[in-house]
Amino acid sequence: MAVALAAAAGKLRRAIGRSCPWQPFSTEPGPPHGAAVRDAFLSFFRDRHGHRLVPSATVRPRGDPSLLFVNAGMNQFKPIFLGTVDPRSEMAGFRRVVNSQKCVRAGGRHNDLEDVGRDLSHHTFFEMLGNWAFGGEYFKEEACSMAWELLTQVYGIPEDRLWVSYFSGDSQTGLDPDLETRDIWLSLGVPASRVLSFGPQENFWEMGDTGPCGPCTEIHYDLAGGVGSPQLVELWNLVFMQHYREADGSLQLLPQRHVDTGMGLERLVAVLQGKRSTYDTDLFSPLLDAIHQSCGAPPYSGRVGAADEGRIDTAYRVVADHIRTLSVCIADGVSPGMSGAPLVLRRILRRAVRYSTEVLQAPPGFLGSLVPVVVETLGSAYPELEKNSVKIASLVSEDEAAFLASLQRGRRIIDRTVKRLGPSDLFPAEVAWSLSLSGNLGIPLDLVELMLEEKGVKLDTAGLEQLAQKEAQHRAQQAEADQEDRLCLDVHALEELHRQGIPTTDDSPKYNYTLHPNGDYEFGLCEARVLQLYSETGTAVASVGAGQRCGLLLDRTNFYAEQGGQASDRGYLVRTGQQDMLFPVAGAQLCGGFILHEAMAPERLQVGDQVQLYVDKAWRMGCMVKHTATHLLSWALRQTLGPTTEQRGSHLNPERLRFDVATQTLLTTEQLRTVESYVQEVVGQDKPVFMEEVPLAHTARIPGLRSLDEVYPDPVRVVSVGVPVAHALGPASQAAMHTSVELCCGTHLLSTGAVGDLVIIGERQLVKGITRLLAITGEQAQQAREVGQSLSQEVEAASERLSQGSRDLPEAHRLSKDIGRLTEVAESAVIPQWQRQELQTTLKMLQRRANTAIRKLEKGQATEKSQELLKRHSEGPLIVDTVSAESLSVLVKVVRQLCKQAPSISVLLLSPQPTGSVLCACQVAQDATPTFTAEAWALAVCSHMGGKAWGSRVVAQGTGHTADLEAALGTARAYALSQL
């Protein structure tokens, strides 16, 4: 009822819109502003043609792990195109839609990052104007006429400046030319000379390797204006989704057709403002002016290539584009980080910093100062920019400052190192590697090479490649499955340390961190002295040289050594007084009270050196989040499974946590869901986490205290969530029965809110009685929930298709194949485990129903075909013929039906397939001679066709390939007659 009313209301709005005189989109003299161009597009489709205005989706894809960023206007509507939209959702009611979508193309399949700045058109962020018609609301004629009306009558583009293209067809796939679209353009008055046809590469759009697709028509603008040869740029692409690309490459017609159009706002504005470059429009000119005013560089002049002396204009374009991308992404919740989309954004920011400082000589804080200009130009269309402007500027400025500091330190290291080099010496690879380490200075290697090039020094690239390979091998060795190559102190080394009187390592500084009111953690540095050094082979040495991997013993450290299931810290150390040279620390191991740091020495290091240690904040925070989450998970399991539930082990790193629990069976779907809800409740309350060392004997007073079968130090550290440790130790306290209280030496959050969320993504039984759970937290957990929701919608859509019934076998097989694909996705996707179990149960039931439907259709088809064959072969003991069959299963059923209705007849049928293969099935009569077997009969025929056969004395089947079916049928008849 609601959908019908909405459709009626839409028709009424469109009728009113057509009856009202259309107002020009700009009454002001001069070229239109970019904002007016955007507004005119949206209002044209909304007010005149009854489209629903849908806000832009965030650039962070929702429930689509295949994308780093939203890179096209159609991304948010993929559930409609794929038929997976939730029928209860608002999107299910979309019929005709218009919007302006924020898009980012940097990383992944569509990556324009390295092209930005080099020419006058590429952008990492752009706006895609689009209108859509779903389910056949309208199609080619209306889409083309509306586009032509908007461009020529509203925007006022001269018709003689516009060219169009259409799909010329494809002989390989059997697709005919899209003459319908051609004729539409001709009927709209486009001269035949400006209506061009192209093949599938230019004018056939596909979503991916499989999925909806169809011919498209492009509208091009002639920059030359009829003077000389045309200079065409694509303006608008109108896609007519009417096909579906199957996994085998074949095309099927879609049950519902859709229109998907896209026109880049930046290019459209350039055309309407009479500019050759998008950077010359008012979408960018405020930014370019602000850059000029802040940097004092020569004004932007639009030069490229060799004409752009000093790469000044290139830098202008890079900075203007990248600050837009950064602002939009951060406003949408994507911040610079260390993996995935955040890592790409970090590259974008550092690329902008490089050009602004190295080329434009911009002052510190420059990039952050441009954020208000971005808000001014885009904020009216995307209010989230203004809402988050302070956050955006702060994050940009912080990362800019961090990178500038890294650059300054890097330059000093390079200067000092270069002074030591001879005239023909190469720059040491180990120093360059130290500069480029992710998480420390983080200077891209190409920038290191550029800085060296400016000094006339070449980098030891061969050595750098060796270090990269060595580091990759070492990281692989650090994996859980391969631990044997780690530096470690054996019993002899420990004895020697004791003999020399070297004290064990004081690692209490690892707990030296604070939580600020804004939610940020601060980790203090640690001053220490080198007490002992070990070579890569484990031999004690007095010093190590440049490029050597080594082990260090210090008198004290703030690094957490791997223990208690928590991965060790990473970071770096510097010699006191020589802050510029970083010694990367890959990990720390606890060996008999001594903490051995695994490091790479970029230059000489010796016993007695004073050093300062810095932990990798992001890595440490990741471990703290996962460790606190592990405690909450342990408590939630006890709340769900009972107070006697025991932990049997755990391991965590910044990416995920693993938890082994004693259970006789795997957790049920409801238990998994309950465990997560307990954790979410505590996280949502942002409870404080208390940590305190107490005498080991006192911990015996705590009823319900969680501890493992380990030897604990005395005093021991108690970690309590929401309840002060002193209160938990009280004689009458029941705190540990109602919250998480554990003995633990790990590093933890100071409040639970930073966990964000927890999702159990995997469950398996290690051995009888022990279940292993895998879990993730924070944004990863939220993403898993989004993917799970998206997959659930796809399964619901498949269920709906199954309920509607299949008209024919091909459709039934497609549905069965789709259910099989969903089953595979549900098995491997990173989604909540409880949801995986629910989906697998549903999909198993759907697959059974789909198979039943296929068997029913096959039986009906077999009955029909067998009756036709009996009419044609009413006499004689033999039926040898061809028949169309969708599969070998159908062909076998036809043969059996024939023999059931005529037991005295022997039957062999061949069925040619579109792929060129030939299916074969046969059955001999009940009274056939003992020498006449179905298997031998099928083998004789299939061998003739260059194939194979299998079966029994009574029934057999096979496959082959032949261009001469009559010859194959002749072979079948001759063999059978020889046996009768």
From Swiss-Prot:
Note accompanying the cofactor annotation: Binds 1 zinc ion per subunit.
Positions bound to Zn(2+): 627, 631, 744, 748
GO biological process: mitochondrial alanyl-tRNA aminoacylation; negative regulation of cGAS/STING signaling pathway
Catalytic activity, as annotated: tRNA(Ala) + L-alanine + ATP = L-alanyl-tRNA(Ala) + AMP + diphosphate; (S)-lactate + ATP + H(+) = (S)-lactoyl-AMP + diphosphate; (S)-lactoyl-AMP + L-lysyl-[protein] = N(6)-[(S)-lactoyl]-L-lysyl-[protein] + AMP + 2 H(+)
Annotated compartments: Mitochondrion
Transit peptide location on this chain: 1-23
SMART domains xref list: tRNA_SAD
Cofactor(s) the record lists: Zn(2+)
Alphabetically ordered keywords of this record: Aminoacyl-tRNA synthetase, ATP-binding, Ligase, Metal-binding, Mitochondrion, Nucleotide-binding, Protein biosynthesis, RNA-binding, Transit peptide, tRNA-binding, Zinc
Entry's Gene Ontology molecular function annotations: alanine-tRNA ligase activity; ATP binding; peptide lactyltransferase (ATP-dependent) activity; tRNA binding; zinc ion binding
Chief location: mitochondrion
Cellular component, GO annotation: mitochondrion
Enzyme Commission (EC) number: 6.1.1.7, 6.-.-.-
Binding, L-alanine: 237, 260
InterPro entries: aa-tRNA-synth_II/BPL/LPL, Ala-tRNA-lgiase_IIc, Ala-tRNA-ligase_IIc_anticod-bd, Ala-tRNA-synth_IIc_core, Ala-tRNA-synth_IIc_N, Ala-tRNA_ligase, Ala_tRNA_ligase_euk/bac, Thr/Ala-tRNA-synth_IIc_edit
PANTHER family: ALANINE--TRNA LIGASE, MITOCHONDRIAL, ALANYL-TRNA SYNTHETASE
Domain notes per entry: Consists of three domains; the N-terminal catalytic domain, the editing domain and the C-terminal C-Ala domain. The editing domain removes incorrectly charged amino acids, while the C-Ala domain, along with tRNA(Ala), serves as a bridge to cooperatively bring together the editing and aminoacylation centers thus stimulating deacylation of misacylated tRNAs.
Family membership noted in the UniProt record: Belongs to the class-II aminoacyl-tRNA synthetase family.
Function recorded in the entry: Catalyzes the attachment of alanine to tRNA(Ala) in a two-step reaction: alanine is first activated by ATP to form Ala-AMP and then transferred to the acceptor end of tRNA(Ala). Also edits incorrectly charged tRNA(Ala) via its editing domain. In presence of high levels of lactate, also acts as a protein lactyltransferase that mediates lactylation of lysine residues in target proteins, such as CGAS. Acts as an inhibitor of cGAS/STING signaling by catalyzing lactylation of CGAS, preventing the formation of liquid-like droplets in which CGAS is activated.
Subunit structure: Monomer.
Protein name, entry field: Alanine--tRNA ligase, mitochondrial
Source organism (scientific name): Mus musculus
